[in-house]
Amino acid sequence: MHSFQLLGLAALGSLVAAAPSPSRVSDLTERSSSCTFTDAAKASSSASSCSSIVLKDIAVPAGKTLDLSHVKDGTTITFEGTTTFGYKEWKGPLIRLAGKDITVTMAKGAVIDGEGSRWWDGKGTNGGKTKPKFLYAHKLEDSTIKGLNIKNTPVQAISVQANNLHLTDITIDNSDGDSKGGHNTDGFDISESNGVYISGANVKNQDDCIAINSGKNIEFTGGTCSGGHGLSIGSIGGRDDNTVQGVKITDSTVTNSDNGIRIKTIVDETGSVSDVTYSNIKLSGIHKKGIVIQQDYKNGGPTGKPSNGIPIKDVTVDGITGSVDSKATPVYILCGSGSCSDWTWKNVKLSGGKSSSECKNLPSGVSC
């Protein structure tokens, strides 16, 4: 009898050892879960239980955010069909993303349509209707956003505050705003980030194609920008973080825009801009300035009196070619006393327009 008991206990022990622990079963189920949502509220509340998320023909209610900021590490998010948003005057954002090792992508033929003309009044964020920001890519780490097709954002499209984020083959088409009052429709606004890599972007808008306000190790390559204010660093100053370091903007085109490439720092503020490269940028149809680097910026209009609290150093401008309009200025440099230094300036070939006689404090080797 005693021996039978021992055998029974041994068999029971082997069964217990062979069975997976409840936590492991639970982990396996969660890792493999795939969810398709057609309701915005359900997506926002339940996304954290899924490892693969499909957002199909989502209609986000007015005044609400499609909140995908609590997803699990490693989640894949796919937009399918048409994503739309109800109308309300508010600050937004309409979409919020966050997390680690997140992949955001889009099915063929899908679109995220902000229907921005409902808010457009020619004033952007400077008055008139309160307009929601479109997409916050904040607190993303080691993540990828690729292939998004975004249309008609009320104001700024993608706000980035992230570490090691890749944004690939993204289209932002606000061209309807040219005739319907679009304003401040920036493509990518980057701040407080380390490692942002944008490639293959196609942006049509009425403001900066990209605006880097702070951060380091930022790259923009293979982009096409049309209708806006060009490839910008700044405006720098007046924020919690006013340092830009390690920027490469290369192999891109800017057409039918106010400016080509631009660095602007706010007058009488402090900060720094360093280790910046603009290389192989082709310009055409530039209405105001092909290359503009100014230290007198102020919203509402430059002062004409540059300050030197935000030095701009270690800048390479190489291979900026193309043309500007007949009334435009090919190159305009306005630096504070001693605050622009160690620049490399070569292969700048811009035709058209009129040279400026108002350039000031140019670094060695640079000409207007």
Swiss-Prot record:
The keyword Mitochondrion does not apply. GO terms for molecular function: galacturan 1,4-alpha-galacturonidase activity; polygalacturonase activity. It catalyses: (1,4-alpha-D-galacturonosyl)n+m + H2O = (1,4-alpha-D-galacturonosyl)n + (1,4-alpha-D-galacturonosyl)m. One of its GO terms (biological process) is pectin catabolic process. Pfam families: Glyco_hydro_28 (PF00295). The keyword Cell membrane does not apply. Residues 19-31 form a propeptide. PbH1 repeats lie at residues 162-192, 193-214, 215-235, 244-265, 273-295, 307-328. Keywords: Cell wall biogenesis/degradation, Disulfide bond, Glycosidase, Hydrolase, Repeat, Secreted, Signal, Zymogen. InterPro entries: Glyco_hydro_28 (IPR000743), Glycosyl_hydrlase_28 (IPR050434), PbH1 (IPR006626), Pectin_lyas_fold (IPR012334), Pectin_lyase_fold/virulence (IPR011050). Belongs to the glycosyl hydrolase 28 family. Involved in maceration and soft-rotting of plant tissue. Hydrolyzes the 1,4-alpha glycosidic bonds of de-esterified pectate in the smooth region of the plant cell wall. This is Probable endopolygalacturonase I. The lineage of its organism: Eukaryota, Fungi, Dikarya, Ascomycota, Pezizomycotina. The gene is pgaI.
